Amino acid sequence: MKKLAAFLSLALAACASLPSTPPALAPVTQPATTTASMPAETRQPVTILISIDGFRPDYLDRGVTPNLNRLKAAGISASMRPAFPSKTYPNHWTLVTGLVPDRHGIVSNNMDDPTGAHPPFTLATDDPWWWNAAEPIWVTAEKLGIRTATMFWPGSNVSWGGVPREGGHGEVDGATRPRDWQQFNQSVTGDQRVDAVIDWLRRPAATRPRFVTLYFDTVDSAGHASGPDSAQVTEAAADVDRLIGRLTDGLAALNQAANVVIVSDHGMAATSSTRTIALDGVLAPADATIGETGPYAGITPTPGREAAVAQALAAPHPHMQCWRKDRIPARFRYGGNPRVPPYICLAATGWSIVKRLPERPFSGGNHGYDHQSAEMRALFIAQGPAFVAGRRLSVFDNVDIAPLLRDLLGLPAGQGLDGSDAPFRKVMR
């Protein structure tokens, strides 16, 4: 996505720069404890899940990521297939639930409730109704007494489960969240995010989390603004690598063993105004409502115009395919959820679907394309006491990450998940 929006009211402006004096991190739900006050102890390994939004695996080959490459050499790695659509919110929810978007319900970054009972879903939506079809791993862990903390992750601010409060406008009673969580705020720098995680781990064992998430958005932002092959993406990758080094140094200073799992949600493809498909040249405006556009588009026919829409979308453009939702090819594992629009049109990788031709030329990057395309591949590195060193795995699907995390935390195997821990069984100690 172009920039991860605030989970409640904060939205990110494209290409926004960080302030020279960032605001202090909002208070966590438990105060940090200084190292001096901690008794000597043998620390139980923690699991840290890190998302570097929009980081393609081949960014590791640019010579600017020594810390990531060191972890790769000391652990296991692979190119990972995202779920379709290769967008931020659907894939972040897949990573922590083990379900494809069609089953967990976050089928796009922007959605409409087909019943009309709820306002449209946007990047700021925290109404549990949208999220509660699948249980994220921090909820499973908290239910079993494992303390968790999230330093930004889509959906981690949402109250999971519980009973809707009458007249509460989406508020619930008796819900579960991570014990410590942060409302997303782009002005919180990468250094502050890392330091907050280290502060959590500095606590005594009774209040120290055993599962932590950490999220970085700058590589994705640079990819959208300047394209995946740009110097700006290389600079952003170098800075995130520096932050990974800051984290590992902090863990070493605490003598804190950690199984670190580093992922991205999707890759990035170069885009240009010379590769656009204008829907106003395919459909009469009165025939349909156009939803999200870009690498793919959702289309809802106007009542009574279904036949006209079906005919127009039968062979719409040499660089775009369209399907009625019940005829989307099975390999996408998409189309069964009622939140998916009646028609989905998918552009060829690098092409953009727009409502009308742009008035000004543009270039940059985007994602949301066929999840099996090479440009959409995601990053995977895992290193720590649970993993053997220096093993390269075959490509696997990101639905397998949640089962891996369950193994690391000692949680029961999930029932009815779309993924499994099979890719990792031979490379874990």
Locate predicted features.
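Metal-dependent active-site segment of extracytoplasmic phospho-/sulfohydrolases and closely related
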Residues: 49, 67, 239-279
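Structural recognition of the beta-strand scaffold that forms the well-ordered cores
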Residues: 47-51, 78-81, 94-96, 139-140, ...
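Active-site neighborhoods of enzymes that stabilize oxyanions during catalysis
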Residues: 291-404
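Active-site nucleophile/metal-coordination loop of metallo-enzymes that catalyze phosphate/sulfate
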Residues: 22-44, 56-144, 159-161
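His/Asp/Glu-rich, glycine-adjacent segments
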Residues: 99-227, 354
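Positively charged n-region of N-terminal signal peptides that target proteins for export
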Residues: 1-4
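Loop/turn elements at helix/coil->beta-strand transitions in domains of secreted/extracellular proteins
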Residues: 43-47, 74-77, 103, 143-149, ...
